[in-house]
Amino acid sequence: MTNSFENSRRDLRERAFQALFNMEHGGDFLSASQFAYDYDKVSDQEHDIPAFLLTLVNGVVNHKDELDAIIKEHLKAGWSIERLTLTDRTMLRLGLYEIKFFEETPDRVALNEIIEIAKKYSDETSAKFINGLLSQFVSDSE
């Protein structure tokens, strides 16, 4: 992959992850999304943020408590969501949001996409953990 993003769905998912991660450190919704979308653009002007990116970020933000509750229910005994790394927590929220609430994307596609992003931003162990947890929500009928 080159240093610049295209505008593929995977790239926009990755930017959504970056925006959500930034927001965990105090960034607000629009500025975090704009930064994630513009940070590697050649020109200095801001670009319109694609609706798909905004939908993912806004969806995770609006469903964060519900997503966290679902994730907590599926962690091993003795584990808490706070024990997870911020990277893994953010990816679980993003992947789970797309699987549970974003019907435009088939579950398996959402799962595979978040696994590929996890491999880039985390390690193989985390990618397997995310796969194991999120695969419980993937419908076999797809």
Swiss-Prot record:
UniProt-recorded Gene Ontology molecular function terms: RNA binding
InterPro entries the record matches: NusB-like_sf, NusB_fam, NusB_RsmB_TIM44
Keywords in alphabetical order: RNA-binding, Transcription, Transcription antitermination, Transcription regulation
GO biological process: DNA-templated transcription termination; transcription antitermination
SUPFAM superfamilies, sorted: NusB-like (SSF48013)
Coiled-coil segments on the chain, per record: none
GO CC annotations, alphabetized: cytosol
Function, as annotated: Involved in transcription antitermination. Required for transcription of ribosomal RNA (rRNA) genes. Binds specifically to the boxA antiterminator sequence of the ribosomal RNA (rrn) operons.
Family listed: Belongs to the NusB family.
UniProt protein name: Transcription antitermination protein NusB
